[in-house]
Curated annotation (Swiss-Prot):
PANTHER family for the chain: MITOCHONDRIAL FISSION PROTEIN ELM1, OS02G0535700 PROTEIN
Protein name according to UniProt: Mitochondrial fission protein ELM1
Membrane topology summary: Peripheral membrane protein
Keyword Membrane among record annotations: yes
Entry's Gene Ontology cellular component terms: cytosol; mitochondrial outer membrane
Keywords carried by this UniProt record: Membrane, Mitochondrion, Mitochondrion outer membrane
Places the protein is found: Mitochondrion outer membrane
Main location: mitochondrion
GO BP terms, alphabetized: mitochondrial fission; protein localization to organelle
Length: 427
């Protein structure tokens, strides 16, 4: 079988050197700064947007990281700045107690070994430095043009907003995911449409009246808010074509149709356990006759009680391959070569990426979801992008839909806003 050939992404090049772009070279955006929080799901959205803007070869990644170990695992609800100060105090108390008590270890606070055998403290944390990024934007503006700053996640909000406040003439700051309040701190906010579900009458009826003022967001989206259907990501024509080539030898000979199953993990708004795992395996066994082969991947956060059921029910089936986490991750190969996808309802990212292929996507466990995640599932079903996985499907049946294209659409909106400033992205 020949490798899958996907069309090249449309070229945006005009063939005009940067220096001749509108406004001169200092108005051409050539680089980006990504501010991440250390979580792949958040940073993947930033990198995907950088890629869609054509800046993947010229960006810097900064991270806002929290102290870890001991009591710190219970303090992630605190603002990151206060958390670090508290960690500093606790560590000094701990060190003082060790001096006073000799080698006797504290029962409540433990020192955390790092990879090189040292201890994790404030000095070893790679920080997103507001002052450093602001100086970079200001001092290199005339030579290298404006700086796009893209951040995602709650811990990055204060960093990104401070950069815009201090260098508004030199930067364009994009915050991915709803920052909950004071959206005017950013040049653009990109967030899923279901983040505004709390404003609907249906949602209001689910919340006691005395709590409604605490639920965010509290007002409709402003003009600089870009609403997406799902999550941003790095999946595009070029990445799928590259993956199709890279995984050709492993996947080309597999019996068709190739059904890919992606399993996430329970969330606060989508709880499940072994019961859903058993429902999934029963349904897969039901449709196995119409499958050529089945390949399953589990997240590193998938609960053991879920993975045990998957391995017990399907581990010995000759048609089924379950990724064990030890071999190279086949996820991109699955997206490129899969003929249909079955995805657990909890993960907006996994579903969004599968729905960017235009291939059949079936969702299992949507009835376990509530609040915003349930609204996300509903919107996809209404658009005909996903179907519920019942176990009575003919998996050889092919159907399609206009693929989700949120990342490219968000990038187009950024280009428009830059143009309104007299700025442009490099060709």
């Amino acid at each position: 079988m020949r490798p899958i050939l996907l069309p090249d992404p449309p070229s945006l090049s005009t063939g005009v050197p940067d220096i001749f772009e509108q406004g001169g070279s200092h108005n051409v955006v050539r680089r980006a700064v990504v501010i991440g929080n250390g979580f792949p799901g958040s940073e993947n959205q930033c990198i995907g947007l950088v890629r869609a803007l054509g800046l993947s070869d010229n960006h810097l990644l900064y991270r806002v990281t929290r102290p870890k170990g001991g009591l710190n695992e219970w303090l992630h609800w605190l603002p990151v700045g206060f958390h670090k100060k508290l960690d500093f105090i606790l560590r000094h108390i701990y060190l003082y107690s060790r001096l006073m008590l000799g080698s006797k270890q504290s029962k409540y606070i433990s020192s955390v070994p790092s990879e090189n055998g040292g201890n994790v403290g404030l000095a070893s944390i790679l920080e997103a430095d507001v002052k450093g990024i602001v100086n970079l934007a200001r001092q290199t503006y005339e030579k290298d043009g404006p700086l796009i700053v893209i951040a995602c996640g709650r811990d990055t909000i204060s960093i990104a907003s401070s950069i815009r406040r201090l260098a508004s003439e030199n930067v364009f700051v994009v915050q991915i995911q709803h920052p909950r309040s004071h959206l005017n701190r950013f040049d653009m906010v990109i967030t899923p449409r279901h983040d505004y579900y709390p404003l609907t009458l249906e949602a209001q009826e689910q919340v006691p009246r005395f709590m409604r003022s605490w639920i965010t967001p509290r007002e409709p989206p402003q003009d600089h808010v870009v609403l997406t259907t799902g999550a941003l990501h790095q999946i595009d024509y070029a990445s799928l074509r590259k993956a199709a080539s890279a995984w050709h030898d492993e996947f080309a000979a597999l019996p068709k149709p190739l059904v890919v199953v992606n399993i996430g993990w329970p969330r606060s708004n989508c709880r499940y356990g072994a019961d859903l795992a058993k429902q999934l395996t029963d349904s897969l066994l039901n449709v196995l006759a119409t499958c050529g082969s089945v390949r399953i991947t589990l997240s590193y956060k998938t609960p053991a009680k879920v993975s045990r059921v998957i391995f017990k029910e399907l581990g010995d089936n000759p048609k089924v391959y379950i990724w064990n986490g030890q071999e190279p991750n086949p996820y991109m190969g699955h997206l490129a070569w899969g003929d249909a996808f079955v995805v657990t309802a909890d993960s907006v990212s996994l579903i969004s990426e599968a729905c960017s292929t235009g291939k059949p996507v079936y969702v299992v466990g949507a009835d376990h979801c509530k609040w915003k995640i349930a609204e996300f599932q509903k919107s996809l079903r209404e658009r005909g992008v996903v179907r519920s996985f019942t176990g009575f499907e003919d998996m050889s049946e092919s159907w399609s839909y206009p693929p989700l294209n949120d990342t490219a659409e968000a990038a187009t909106r950024i280009r428009r806003e830059l143009a309104a400033r007299g700025w442009s992205l490099r060709s």
